[in-house]
């Protein structure tokens, strides 16, 4: 018979298990390096966002300040409307051929009066269009220029060429009357892009509407005008 096992009093769980060795964290491990770079990248992104936000806030503040300053100067000076006149006009040719092509040669001389004492005007775009009835037949461009305060500027324009112009029944009737009298009723419109200057501050671009209607211009080659001469006309100025 085999040898007897010694008597065990109570439960027996086997030999004790030693605790696992403590893990030592290495600060040179790849995991720790990635954490550092990740934190650094987050800080840089955060700083970049803060800088961009600061720049945007500064630009907005500057724009608001300039806008308020321009408004204050506008309210102080209360600029008067610039006045436009057709001072003289010469119609050298105005005739239709059988194909409804209008042959024209029109000289329009404008006088522009800036009545303001402290406000100058930049004319960035300046074009003149001639109309017969409601049909535009030609145009001319003027080079950009600056008009000082309390200044009168004379602009000479020439609208010349040929163009297809189809007139309605009413305009055809008017044309027959004009050909008979030798005096033609022509309208002119000015297309402008202007900026006002208050001291060192310039306004935003404005596009006023200038209409010079019902210009009665004698045809130069006509002998039926009875000595009629062109009379200066003030144009309508609309800044709305």
UniProtKB/Swiss-Prot annotation:
A Pfam entry, by short name:
LEA_2
- Glycan-linked positions: 109, 141, 151, 223
Where are the membrane-spanning stretches?
Answer: 57-77
Look up the record and report any one GO term of the cellular component aspect: chloroplast
Q: What induces it?
A: Induced by spermine and infection with the cucumber mosaic virus (CMV-Y and CMV-B2 strains).
User: What is the annotated localization of this protein?
Assistant: Cell membrane
Its membrane topology is listed as:
Single-pass membrane protein
What biological process terms from GO does the record include?
Answer: defense response to virus
Q: Give the keywords, sorted.
A: Cell membrane, Glycoprotein, Membrane, Plant defense, Transmembrane, Transmembrane helix
- So which tissues is this one expressed in? Expressed at low levels in roots, rosette leaves, cauline leaves, stems, flowers and siliques.
Main subcellular location: membrane
What this chain does, per the record? May play a role in plant immunity.
Any other comment in the entry? Plants over-expressing NHL2 develop leaf necrotic lesions surrounded by chlorosis.
The record's listing under PANTHER family reads: LATE EMBRYOGENESIS ABUNDANT (LEA) HYDROXYPROLINE-RICH GLYCOPROTEIN FAMILY, OS05G0199100 PROTEIN
Q: Under which name does UniProt file this protein?
A: NDR1/HIN1-like protein 2
Q: In which organism is this protein found?
A: Arabidopsis thaliana
């Amino acid at each position: 018979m085999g040898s007897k096992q010694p008597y065990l009093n109570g439960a027996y769980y086997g030999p004790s298990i030693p605790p696992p060795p403590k893990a030592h964290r290495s600060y040179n491990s790849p995991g720790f390096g990635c954490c550092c770079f990740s934190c650094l990248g987050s800080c840089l992104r955060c700083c970049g966002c803060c800088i961009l936000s600061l720049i945007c806030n500064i630009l907005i503040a500057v724009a608001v300040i300039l806008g308020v300053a321009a408004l204050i100067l506008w309210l102080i000076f209360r600029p008067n409307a610039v006045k436009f006149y057709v001072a003289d006009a010469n119609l050298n040719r105005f005739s239709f051929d059988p194909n409804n092509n209008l042959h024209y040669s029109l000289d329009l001389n404008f006088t522009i009066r800036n009545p303001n004492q402290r406000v100058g005007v930049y004319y960035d775009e300046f074009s003149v269009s001639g109309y017969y009835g409601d049909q535009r037949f030609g145009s001319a461009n003027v080079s950009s220029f600056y008009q000082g305060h309390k200044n009168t500027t004379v602009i000479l324009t020439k609208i010349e060429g040929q163009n297809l112009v189809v007139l309605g029944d009413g305009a055809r009737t008017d044309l027959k009357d004009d050909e008979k009298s030798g005096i033609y009723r022509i309208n002119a419109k000015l297309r402008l892009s202007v900026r006002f200057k208050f001291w060192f501050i310039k306004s935003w671009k404005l596009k006023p509407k200038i209409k010079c209607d019902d210009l009665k211009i004698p045809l130069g080659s006509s002998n039926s005008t009875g000595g009629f001469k062109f009379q200066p006309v003030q144009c309508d100025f609309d800044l709305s």
